[in-house]
């Protein structure tokens, strides 16, 4: 990691081979600065998809965030990503499409989410997959959250950015 001290990495992280035989309640798979590349061009595509597949049998609930959400939707369900004409950047109003879903307990029907991304997945592609349920979207920012496998897989678009993310 270029921003995290090596001692922190050694203390709080492990490699996949040491985890293989274990079961976990939850896993978060997050983004990477590779969203403008085709998935198969990513150097570690084979390794990350192996982890995606492993999580289905060893993890109760998996949260795919940002690039990992697009990658997981593509790998598991064939949902493509699309390049945006210009980078989406800002805070956008979103609505809940399944307001009684437990993940929205305590949420208002409308809520705001920051986005910073060059690519998107589209509502119509998610709706073509019977196993996927669209949970939230924005008129301006598009798809925000989808769920599959009875709430065991959540896919959430990029919801954060740093002060230099507009670059």
Language model regions located:
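Short helix-loop capping/hinge motifs at secondary-structure junctions, enriched
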Residues: 100-104
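Cysteine-nucleophile active-site neighborhood
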Residues: 29-98
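Conserved small/polar residues in nucleotide/adenosyl-binding loops
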Residues: 161-165
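N-terminal beta1-alpha1 cap of cysteine-dependent amidohydrolase-like domains
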Residues: 1-40, 47, 167
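Short, well-ordered beta-to-alpha junction loops that form the rim of enzyme active sites
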Residues: 67, 158-159
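A polyampholytic, Gly/Pro-enriched intrinsically disordered region
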Residues: 13-16, 73, 112
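Catalytic beta-strand/loop cores that center a nucleophilic Ser/Cys/Thr
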Residues: 105-153, 158
